[in-house]
């Protein structure tokens, strides 16, 4: 399993976007990452200027969003949807997407994934697919 460090994950996003903007060939995962960065112009300055942002710690104080974490969760959700893991995720996403735009539906998945990961960390367990899917059902 690929388990990058914080810096490796951040550098991956920066490099994928840089290659995309330069018109260089991208791996399938880099293509997904670049497309997700493209959906978030509010993060372009962060991604395009790693010398200013790569080492920065983002805290929840003041409602600050960690753009690297947000994009990494987007990427995780995209991978989950590709393989319908956990089973039923794609169907839940389609229900959500039927009631809002696709990007908003993706954000609902990200929020539920974040809640599921937070709960697993708090309890000292692995992520619970039932908790994840139940969260999505409540949002549909």
Task: Describe the predicted segments one by one.
Residues 1-44:
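N-terminal leader/targeting peptides and immediately adjacent processing regions
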Residues 24-26, 105, 124, 128:
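Short, surface-exposed helix-loop/turn micro-motifs enriched in polar/charged residues
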Residues 29-96:
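Aromatic-anchored, charged helix-turn/loop surface patch used as a conserved interaction hotspot
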Residues 99-100:
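Non-globular disordered terminal and juxtamembrane segments underlying protein topogenesis/assembly
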Residues 107-111:
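Well-ordered alpha/beta subsegment
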Residues 114:
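Residues lining hydrophobic/aromatic ligand-binding pockets adjacent to catalytic sites
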Residues 118, 122-140:
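Glycine-rich, aromatic-bearing surface loops/beta-hairpins
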């Amino acid at each position: 399993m690929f388990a990058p460090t914080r810096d490796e994950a951040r550098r991956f996003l920066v490099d994928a976007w840089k290659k995309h903007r330069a018109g260089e060939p991208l791996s399938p995962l880099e293509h997904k990452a670049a497309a997700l960065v493209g959906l978030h112009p509010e993060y372009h300055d962060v991604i395009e200027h790693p010398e200013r942002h790569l080492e920065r710690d983002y805290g929840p104080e003041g409602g600050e969003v960690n753009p690297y974490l947000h994009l990494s969760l987007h990427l995780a959700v995209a991978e989950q949807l590709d393989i319908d893991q956990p089973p039923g995720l794609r169907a839940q996403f389609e229900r959500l997407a039927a009631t809002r735009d696709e990007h908003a539906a993706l954000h609902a998945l990200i929020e539920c994934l974040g809640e599921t990961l937070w709960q697993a960390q708090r309890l000292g367990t692995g992520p619970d697919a039932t908790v994840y899917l139940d969260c999505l059902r409540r949002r549909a």
